[in-house]
Swiss-Prot record:
HAMAP family per UniProt: PdxH
GO MF term set: FMN binding; pyridoxamine phosphate oxidase activity
Oligomer and partners: Homodimer.
Function: Catalyzes the oxidation of either pyridoxine 5'-phosphate (PNP) or pyridoxamine 5'-phosphate (PMP) into pyridoxal 5'-phosphate (PLP).
Binding residues for FMN: 69-74, 84-85, 90-91, 113, 148-149, 193, 203
Pathway assigned in UniProt: Cofactor metabolism; pyridoxal 5'-phosphate salvage; pyridoxal 5'-phosphate from pyridoxamine 5'-phosphate: step 1/1; Cofactor metabolism; pyridoxal 5'-phosphate salvage; pyridoxal 5'-phosphate from pyridoxine 5'-phosphate: step 1/1
This protein's name: Pyridoxine/pyridoxamine 5'-phosphate oxidase
Domain of life: Bacteria
Amino acid sequence: MRTLTCVPDESTAKVHTCRAPFMLHRVMIPPDPIQRFAELFERAKQAIAVDPNAMVVATVGDDGRPSARVVLLKDFDARGFVFYTNHESRKGREARAHPYAALCFYWQPLNEQVRVEGRVERVTDAEADAYFQSRARGSQVGAWASLQSQPLATREELEARVAEVEQKYAGQPVPRPPHWSGFRVVPDRIEFWHAQESRLHDRHVYLREDGGWRTQMLYP
């Protein structure tokens, strides 16, 4: 793990003096980016105790303004990267209206970053149902109670909605709300970044072409 060191500066508001040493490491380039991601993700799970599957998801609105937030990756395979959400949330509305998104993983203990770009598609109902039933009951209730991204007057209003849902489904399974499902980001571009000394980082991008992947190094 890198230790961040900040050189004393006359202003505590400045962070440009913060530096971290990097482990020199030559990156092997497998032909399949999903395989490469899977190997890195296994290392991240060993190195990061809390939420190694955290990622930034960026979408764009009708006005062209991007929005980004941290969510949890719930599944990935050759088809793409899956997360779940309320489809009436801001990210849900934007992903449906403009079905492209960007993801970013940053695993600081590994000196690794992965960026994913691609088309967004909805997961199947069977996939969404299976994942929803694996969630804690409180999270299932919350999926019904929360009008995600809508204005909320008081915390008590939310708690009252939670109580109503709990009463409605007392003693029985909580079904998946029709507005709650998953999105799969189908990648057409995946970039791997590995930190090196003097900011001469390793960057390799995979571009989907003719049903396969073409790799290309990039200047840091």
